[in-house]
């Protein structure tokens, strides 16, 4: 199999839970150790071997595109999602005509280590499946209530969702996808809306969703002042003073 060089990044949401520290910025541009969160995601993916990015934007997408236009180091194809108020599966569907084979799917607000993405990219993938990177270090999950949980049977995920009762790992927001995912999302739509988990749930029922354990790898989703502060500490970065003051006030 040829090396996978394309990543799709979902960056369309409005990030309302980070509003107290983001000011007027869209969430992907919120500062994390001197750089926007999205830039950290892209740098880590680039170090893992990604060369081509397809970034789906929606809320204040013009501001995000303008920021990266000033630094053309990344090869980016921008995709607009005017329906950014809908679930994230809709955002991924907007990218379907820009994908030309297996790809790495990332969230614009999930920080991770490059070696974790590199290890996922090395996994052999069939043309009818998706591989989800999962974390079984449950005691280390910062906000379990908000985490998307998975239940595995061997190498396969058999159930996925935030509310499932039986689980043994959590979804890290990092997927190795074959283009088949688009068909599953399309058939999962209800009222012209679907989440990634909706599509993954359909695949899990047919044993088409495999799990990849990140072992000692670190990651963190950043969707609130508290998780921003936690991620800064987890990755060894001091939280900027003015952010720290706002985080303390919001907790």
Regions found by a protein language model. Give the residues of each.
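N-terminal glycine-rich phosphate-binding loop and ensuing alpha1 helix
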Residues: 2-62, 76
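Conserved alpha/beta core of the MobA/IspD/sugar-nucleotide pyrophosphorylase nucleotidyltransferase superfamily
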Residues: 2-7, 168-251
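Phosphate- and divalent-cation-binding pockets in alpha/beta enzyme and binding domains
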Residues: 17, 40, 63-66, 88, ...
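Residues at the starts of beta-strands that form the adenosine-phosphate
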Residues: 6, 51-53, 75, 102, ...
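Conserved core of the sugar-phosphate nucleotidyltransferase
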Residues: 113-190
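Conserved beta-strand segments of alpha/beta enzyme cores
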Residues: 28, 75-77, 156, 208-210
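Conserved beta-loop-beta/alpha segment of the NTase-like Rossmann-fold superfamily
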Residues: 65, 71-148
């Amino acid at each position: 199999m040829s090396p996978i060089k394309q990543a799709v990044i979902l960056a369309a949401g409005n990030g309302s839970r980070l509003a107290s520290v983001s000011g007027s910025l869209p969430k992907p541009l919120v500062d994390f150790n001197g750089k926007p969160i999205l830039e950290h995601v892209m740098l880590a993916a680039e170090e893992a071997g990604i060369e081509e990015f397809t970034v789906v934007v929606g809320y204040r997408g013009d501001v995000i595109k303008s920021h990266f236009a000033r630094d053309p180091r990344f090869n980016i194809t921008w995709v607009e999602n005017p329906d950014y108020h809908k679930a994230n599966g809709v955002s991924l569907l907007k990218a379907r005509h820009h994908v030309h084979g297996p790809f790495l799917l990332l969230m614009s607000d999930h920080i991770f280590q490059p070696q974790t993405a590199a290890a996922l990219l090395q996994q052999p993938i069939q043309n009818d499946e998706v591989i989800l990177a999962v974390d079984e270090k449950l005691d280390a999950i910062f906000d379990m209530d908000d985490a998307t949980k998975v239940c595995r049977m061997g190498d396969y995920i058999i159930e996925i969702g935030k509310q499932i009762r039986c689980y043994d790992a959590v979804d890290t927001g990092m997927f190795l996808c074959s283009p088949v995912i688009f068909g599953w999302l399309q058939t999962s739509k209800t009222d012209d809306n679907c989440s990634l988990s909706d599509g993954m749930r359909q695949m899990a029922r047919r044993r088409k969703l495999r799990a990849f354990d990140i072992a000692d790898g670190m990651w963190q989703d950043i969707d609130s002042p508290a998780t921003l502060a936690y991620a800064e500490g987890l990755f060894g970065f001091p939280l900027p003073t003015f952010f720290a003051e706002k985080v303390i006030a919001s907790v």
